[in-house]
């Protein structure tokens, strides 16, 4: 068996006039994340981790922020397409672990829905998807509430050829 671990990262600026979508969940808040797509920072980090684990590059290589097809794109659809490309490369996704770093809003009430979305999109049992939420203890741009960051790790495996 060929086990691979991928690491993903994303950050987006918080701005007025946009919805806040994290993990495919719309979260009530006065600001949202700025981006070409729906700017779902968590799903972008997970997508990057999966592409990285399969040595398929990164999210920008597959879903460029200069491509008008992805303007306002639903990041859940992008994650599903990522999973299909990882599978096409011969890998199965085993688990995902992720962390969201945001001073506000409180994300704990939304974690279960995020996990359910990610598990559904990746075709995984819920117990193979983890999402954690942390603050930056009021330090730096994250602590000042200027943006939200996400980090993710993913394990994929390719069965040995017979």
From Swiss-Prot:
Domain of life: Bacteria
UniProt cofactor(s): a divalent metal cation
Protein name, UniProt field: 2-C-methyl-D-erythritol 2,4-cyclodiphosphate synthase
Signal sequence coordinates: none
Family under the similarity heading: Belongs to the IspF family.
Reactions it catalyzes: 4-CDP-2-C-methyl-D-erythritol 2-phosphate = 2-C-methyl-D-erythritol 2,4-cyclic diphosphate + CMP
Subunit structure comment from the entry: Homotrimer.
Residues given in the record as a divalent metal cation binding sites: 10, 12, 44
Keyword Acyltransferase in record: no
Organism: Burkholderia thailandensis (strain ATCC 700388 / DSM 13276 / CCUG 48851 / CIP 106301 / E264)
Site (Transition state stabilizer): 36, 135
Gene Ontology BP annotations: isopentenyl diphosphate biosynthetic process, methylerythritol 4-phosphate pathway; terpenoid biosynthetic process
One annotated GO molecular function: 2-C-methyl-D-erythritol 2,4-cyclodiphosphate synthase activity
EC id: 4.6.1.12
Function: Involved in the biosynthesis of isopentenyl diphosphate (IPP) and dimethylallyl diphosphate (DMAPP), two major building blocks of isoprenoid compounds. Catalyzes the conversion of 4-diphosphocytidyl-2-C-methyl-D-erythritol 2-phosphate (CDP-ME2P) to 2-C-methyl-D-erythritol 2,4-cyclodiphosphate (ME-CPP) with a corresponding release of cytidine 5-monophosphate (CMP).
InterPro entries given in the database record: MECDP_synthase (IPR003526), MECDP_synthase_CS (IPR020555), MECDP_synthase_sf (IPR036571)
Pathway: Isoprenoid biosynthesis; isopentenyl diphosphate biosynthesis via DXP pathway; isopentenyl diphosphate from 1-deoxy-D-xylulose 5-phosphate: step 4/6
């Amino acid at each position: 068996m060929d086990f691979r671990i991928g690491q993903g990262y994303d950050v987006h600026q918080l701005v007025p006039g946009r919805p806040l979508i994290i993990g495919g969940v719309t979260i009530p808040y006065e600001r949202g994340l700025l981006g070409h797509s729906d700017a779902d920072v968590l799903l972008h980090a997970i997508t990057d981790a999966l592409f990285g684990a399969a040595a398929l590059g990164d999210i920008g290589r597959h879903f460029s922020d200069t491509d008008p097809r992805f303007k306002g794109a639903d990041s859940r659809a992008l994650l599903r397409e990522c999973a299909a490309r990882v599978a096409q490369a011969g890998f199965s996704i085993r688990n995902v672990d992720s962390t969201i770093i945001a001073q506000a809003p409180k994300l704990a009430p939304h974690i279960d829905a995020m996990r359910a979305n990610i598990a559904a999109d990746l075709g995984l049992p819920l117990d193979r998807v983890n999402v954690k939420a942390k603050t930056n203890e009021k330090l730096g741009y994250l602590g000042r509430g200027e943006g939200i960051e996400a980090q993710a790790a993913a394990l994929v495996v390719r069965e040995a050829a017979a």
